[in-house]
């Protein structure tokens, strides 16, 4: 079985994504965001776009989104997905660093098994302000209107918070759910 690829977008927590996956016995590899598209297309069963400081440094991440693989975007990865499908990303009015309470509005896919509200760890200044037309909102908070999104027809998901950080309630579940989607056990 092919591994999941974790795309390093220079975020401070990207190595923790890899660690969280390995702790769940999920085969994964951290790759630079300059890895050739052909290598990503052939080498993995799913893609996790990690966070980072600036979307201009996201390398080939925008191209990875269009490979037909399941994709989970975390923080900056969410922004890449939103932009690629026509959404708008800009500086949030409140931003977020620290504990945030999110309200889940749709428990399918990557948020399956979570309670209605939960504490997560945020570390961002930008946010998705206009949701792309082919996406549904899965979660919201008082500081960010689009905390989690999912494509209506493709296995493409984005979350604003950091499930890889220990301060996020049961963050491992996002990775378990995404892996189940990648392996066909959960249709998302």
Curated annotation (Swiss-Prot):
Gene Ontology, cellular component aspect: cytosol
Catalytic residues, chain numbering: 75, 162, 164
PROSITE patterns the UniProt entry points to: GATASE_TYPE_1
Keywords attached to this entry: ATP-binding, Glutamine amidotransferase, GMP biosynthesis, Ligase, Nucleotide-binding, Purine biosynthesis
Pfam families (alphabetical): GATase
Keyword ATP-binding on entry: yes
Residues of the Glutamine amidotransferase type-1 domain: 3-188
GO MF annotation terms: ATP binding; GMP synthase activity
EC number, UniProt record: 6.3.5.2
Pathway(s) of this molecule: Purine metabolism; GMP biosynthesis; GMP from XMP (L-Gln route): step 1/1
Record field: catalytic activity: XMP + L-glutamine + ATP + H2O = GMP + L-glutamate + AMP + diphosphate + 2 H(+)
Keyword RNA-binding: no
Function: Catalyzes the synthesis of GMP from XMP.
Alphabetical list of HAMAP family matching this protein: GMP_synthase_A
Subunit annotation: Heterodimer composed of a glutamine amidotransferase subunit (A) and a GMP-binding subunit (B).
NCBIfam families: guaA_Nterm, PRK00758.1
Listed name of the protein: GMP synthase [glutamine-hydrolyzing] subunit A
Gene: guaAA
């Amino acid at each position: 079985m092919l591994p999941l690829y974790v795309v390093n977008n220079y975020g401070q927590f990207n190595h923790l994504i890899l660690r969280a996956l390995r702790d769940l016995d999920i085969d994964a590899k951290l790759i630079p965001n300059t890895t050739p598209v052909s290598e990503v297309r052939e080498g993995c069963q799913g893609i996790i776009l990690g966070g980072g400081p600036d979307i201009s440094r996201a390398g080939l991440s925008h191209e990875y989104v269009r490979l037909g693989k399941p994709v989970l975007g975390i923080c900056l990865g969410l922004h890449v997905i939103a932009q690629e499908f026509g959404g708008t990303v800009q500086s949030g009015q409140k931003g977020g660093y620290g504990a945030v309470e999110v309200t889940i509005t749709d428990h399918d896919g990557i948020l399956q098994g979570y309670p209605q509200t939960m504490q997560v760890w945020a570390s961002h200044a930008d946010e998705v302000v206009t949701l792309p037309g082919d996406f549904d909102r899965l979660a919201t908070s008082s500081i960010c209107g689009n905390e989690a999104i999912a494509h209506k027809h493709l296995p493409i998901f984005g979350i604003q918070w950091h499930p890889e950080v220990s301060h996020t309630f049961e963050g491992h579940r996002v990775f378990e759910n995404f892996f189940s989607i990648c392996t066909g056990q959960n249709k998302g």
